[in-house]
Amino acid sequence: MTERKHGLTYADSGVDIDAGNRLVDLIKPMVRATARAGADSEIGGFGGLFDLKAAGFKDPVLVAATDGVGTKIKVAIDAGLHTGIGIDLVAMSVNDLVVQGAEPLFFLDYFACGKLDPEAAAEIVAGVAEACRESGCALIGGETAEMPGLYKDGDYDLAGFSVGAAERGTLLPSKDIAEGDAVIGLASSGVHSNGFSLVRKIVEKSGLPYDAPAPFSPVMTLGGALLAPTKLYVKSCLQAIRDTGAVKGLAHITGGGFTENIPRVLPKHLGVGIDLPRIPVLPVFKWLAEQGEIAELELLRTFNCGIGMVIIVKADAVDQVTESLTASGESVHLLGQVIAAKGEQRVVYDGHLDLAW
């Protein structure tokens, strides 16, 4: 076949296959470092493999989760800070898996952009790989999509997918959650990955650039503080579940805050009473509340406010569970207890958040 001279190429349309190959070469060592029992984390095949038997499971139930990072990505783009976004991507899925009592097994990511910058993309994947290692989760595959015309140069989006497993009969929440059970919370690392459309609106209102010192943490830039990666709760929570046998349920405090997420793990006739002064409100939320003049109930329905994971435990096992979580490096706070639901109100707040700073 005679090749026509000066014919169009895929590169002429804005898609650079060589750049994609360069990215694969950059990330192979990162991906390989996430290998665990059941997965060798070698990429390049048409599908990722996982051997449940090699991972030690006998009668497993699989649990799947998928999520993104939302408009936090826009803050990362505007601030030029990308590594933490990869951590966020993993955390949003694997934290949801541990809520079900499942051990994360493997993760896949999807990266879409207008023009692929291999080095910048590798920075994001480095964060993904770091979070996978910390969660004991193998990165077994992914997709990079260069889509000129759909995304502007410099813009990108991410999605993640993870699968975990638990032995049959050990899934959470348990069916014996009852009035009087204790509600404890694990401290968050910051805003995590929800509410960023409101965050961006508040930053715009403040007039501060992302490279300005953060008013609530002057040793950091505003962008750096807002982009603090979502905390990974996998290892600490799994350890507490296995050590104590007293964990009845968990709620990952994401979009919808306390108000929407805690009821998701409760029987319909039950709710929780939360003592608001016990929530360790982080300075970032105090600043956001002040700058945005955000009502307290709106804060509680939008942000984690300083608590990223809520755990329901047997009332007589609070000390035991707290000891396990503290040994894993968590900051643990007793927030309240399980109560009878009051009609449509499933989360009852007592007192007020400490928003003074």
UniProtKB/Swiss-Prot annotation:
From which domain of life does this come?
Answer: Bacteria
Q: Name one GO biological process term.
A: 'de novo' IMP biosynthetic process
GO CC annotation terms, alphabetical:
cytosol
Q: Where in the cell is it found?
A: Cytoplasm
Q: What is its EC number?
A: 6.3.3.1
Q: Which UniProt keywords apply?
A: ATP-binding, Cytoplasm, Ligase, Nucleotide-binding, Purine biosynthesis
Give the Gene Ontology MF terms in alphabetical order. ATP binding; phosphoribosylamine-glycine ligase activity; phosphoribosylformylglycinamidine cyclo-ligase activity
Do you know which InterPro entries this protein is assigned to?
Answer: PurM-like_C_dom, PurM-like_C_sf, PurM-like_N, PurM-like_N_sf, PurM_cligase
Alphabetical list of Pfam families matching this protein:
AIRS, AIRS_C
Pathway-wise, it operates in: Purine metabolism; IMP biosynthesis via de novo pathway; 5-amino-1-(5-phospho-D-ribosyl)imidazole from N(2)-formyl-N(1)-(5-phospho-D-ribosyl)glycinamide: step 2/2
List the cysteine pairs that form cystine. Answer: none
Reaction catalysis annotation = 2-formamido-N(1)-(5-O-phospho-beta-D-ribosyl)acetamidine + ATP = 5-amino-1-(5-phospho-beta-D-ribosyl)imidazole + ADP + phosphate + H(+)
Alphabetized HAMAP family for the sequence: AIRS
Q: Which family does it belong to?
A: Belongs to the AIR synthase family.
> This protein is called what?
Phosphoribosylformylglycinamidine cyclo-ligase
Query: What lineage is this protein's organism placed in?
Result: Bacteria, Pseudomonadati, Pseudomonadota, Alphaproteobacteria, Hyphomicrobiales
